[in-house]
Amino acid sequence: MERYDLCFKRLAEKQEGAFVPFVTLGDPTPELSLQIIDALVAGGADALELGIPFSDPLADGPTIQNANLRAFAAGVTPEHCFDMLAAIRQKYPDMPIGLLMYANLVFSNGIDSFYARCQQVGVDSVLVADVPVEESAPFRQAAMRHNVAPIFICPPNAGDDLLREISSHGRGYTYLLSRAGVTGSETRASLPLKHLVDKLREYHAAPALQGFGISEASQVQQAISAGAAGAISGSAVVRIIEKHLNDPALMLSELTAFAASLKAATRS
């Protein structure tokens, strides 16, 4: 959990925002998935947001649904994902690592044992996409017991009560939703969200990272100028993977270049 605090502090000292890519673990294969993460870190990723393959990802558009299907086709299970997470943590001891997932995967072996496993492999945060903050008590309590930050989504239409609740219960960072709907860079992020960022700050929420529809440098700049601490890009990253499935070397170099361009946008 503390890795987020240190990361945001370090970036603030350099007057930079955070660039956080999202990928599904095991897409398109476990081996290549680890190389993809290396390529994104080489391009300047400040933290990682990772998905565990799930059969019915409600919050995700077609790009990330296909990533889930490719990982399933490669035989990836949650147990494989935890092995991969342990390897990623060993390689990047200081990088914040977050999971973005669905409640069924948390329930499957018991909520407490799930968060215990997260702590064991060095996961810093977990966002359970289909559990709203008002239903989150058993999840966030288990998370806090195991020093894992519970992450909550702040929708663009959040009212005052919800903003207070997110601020009070969230740790690590706050996932600021660019717009309603499902993930995907097909639909642009709608801005500005400055009034939400200001409110979250007023209520002492964890720093806001803006996600959903972030696919170009200008959107990262806009998110940061609206006061967000950084931006999360998922579908745009996964589309590069999908586009170059037959040419892994090109895929990896494109991913590094994409990460570098979005990271550069956090500096201006």
Curated annotation (Swiss-Prot):
CDD domains, per database record: Tryptophan_synthase_alpha
GO cellular component, as recorded: cytosol
Assigned keywords, A-Z: Amino-acid biosynthesis, Aromatic amino acid biosynthesis, Lyase, Tryptophan biosynthesis
Pathway noted in the entry: Amino-acid biosynthesis; L-tryptophan biosynthesis; L-tryptophan from chorismate: step 5/5
Keyword Lyase assigned: yes
NCBIfam families referenced in this protein's UniProt entry, alphabetically: trpA (TIGR00262)
Assembly with partners or alone: Tetramer of two alpha and two beta chains.
UniProt protein name: Tryptophan synthase alpha chain
Organism, as annotated: Erwinia tasmaniensis (strain DSM 17950 / CFBP 7177 / CIP 109463 / NCPPB 4357 / Et1/99)
Source lineage: Bacteria, Pseudomonadati, Pseudomonadota, Gammaproteobacteria, Enterobacterales
